[in-house]
Amino acid sequence: MSAAVACVDYFAADVLMAISSGAVVHRGRPGPEGAGPAAGLDVRAARREAASPGTPGPPPPPPAASGPGPGAAAAPHLLAASILADLRGGPGAAPGGASPASSSSAASSPSSGRAPGAAPSAAAKSHRCPFPDCAKAYYKSSHLKSHLRTHTGERPFACDWQGCDKKFARSDELARHHRTHTGEKRFSCPLCSKRFTRSDHLAKHARRHPGFHPDLLRRPGARSTSPSDSLPCSLAGSPAPSPAPSPAPAGL
């Protein structure tokens, strides 16, 4: 019995190796324990040998056909092919099921909810003024905070110059005011020798020159590049003369 089972195992292994390598093998291997050559032995011959007299166990079922049919020789090959397909995980492993490639491609391309090629939405002004009848909105919360002071009247930036109690809502306004105490004139006219404490005063003065051109004020040194100095001037008419420098505090 063990010799017959071993012979069937060797035959199945031969078929698997033949299918995987693409060759056709028509001979069998000798069985172990001196079983002798097994050339031309098929599955039915092995079953008849296993059911020889004197072997305990139920008799084997009768064959389906008296003679070898056209598909009898191909039956072991089909069985081996199905086993090999199961081992390889091919399409025969799960008939009727979706292949792993199709399922993975379907899972890797979910609907994004946006039309292909659509550009992302631009940044919106999400910081809106909460005061009624004010529809202003800003990109940054710091800009909104500065705007809210126009409603509340808050002026947290106070001048620390001795004898000056002025306060401002913005730090750049305080810096510009501080130059009125120090007498600093950072903005020089590119067409003459005059200097000014504010960039808008320089612009008004420079326009009076016959050869004035706006590009002259964009040169380095002609006007400051600080954004705080680009605010519109609240004074009308010709620029007022700069005040004389105040005496420095006694503690300095």
Swiss-Prot record:
Protein name as annotated: Krueppel-like factor 16
Source species taxonomy: Eukaryota, Metazoa, Chordata, Craniata, Vertebrata
Organism, scientific name: Homo sapiens (Human)
Gene3D superfamilies in UniProt: Classic Zinc Finger
PROSITE patterns: ZINC_FINGER_C2H2_1, ZINC_FINGER_C2H2_2
Keyword check for Zinc-finger: yes
GO MF, any single term: DNA-binding transcription factor activity, RNA polymerase II-specific
Compartment(s) where it occurs, according to its Swiss-Prot or TrEMBL record: Nucleus
Phosphothreonine: residues carrying this PTM: T152
Similarity comment: family membership: Belongs to the Sp1 C2H2-type zinc-finger protein family.
Biased composition (Pro residues): 55-65, 240-252
One matching Pfam family: zf-C2H2
